[in-house]
Amino acid sequence: MTTGQSRPATTTQKKHTHMSHEIHENDTVVLGSNKPAWHGLGTVFAGLLSPLRAYIEGVGAREMFESPVLFNGQPVDGYKIISGRYANGAHSALSVVGDSYGLLKDSRFFEILEKVYGGRAVVETAGTLRNGKRIWVLVKRDSWCVSGKDRINTFDLWVNRHDGSGCFELHRTNVRVVWQNTWNL
């Protein structure tokens, strides 16, 4: 099956209050290779999942934008608000940041991944945490066997934040990230 033909194999939608996994009502998780996460959250896709497909099918269900901070109706110099507008109509202010903070929108984030891998990236998992304040994409790299039976996978973990707490990052890991706790490993 090609990435353009992927269809959701299963979808599990659960609403949560604040939990250690940091998956909230406006967050999304997509999982490729027909492998569900052990917690049962997210949308599982059969076959390969490209960054573009992960964006369209799950993570891209929102629009990020900047707006001025207002006090008594007047803009406050040096600050702006980062907000998200979700497909379900919800709107959420994610953070107040300084003017020097550059918003890397989700659509641009996924375009960069497509270019870095020349359109050949295979997304293992992708999602948002903390109502969209954090976003990740886990791209599968190499796989090998130790002692002929223990499979080891390596991934590129791409991270972006919309809360001003960090920047666009790349990490190498052998952990399949599916929520906050596995992101922390």
Model features per residue range: what roles?
Residues 2-4, 10-112:
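Feature for intrinsically disordered/low-complexity regulatory segments and propeptides
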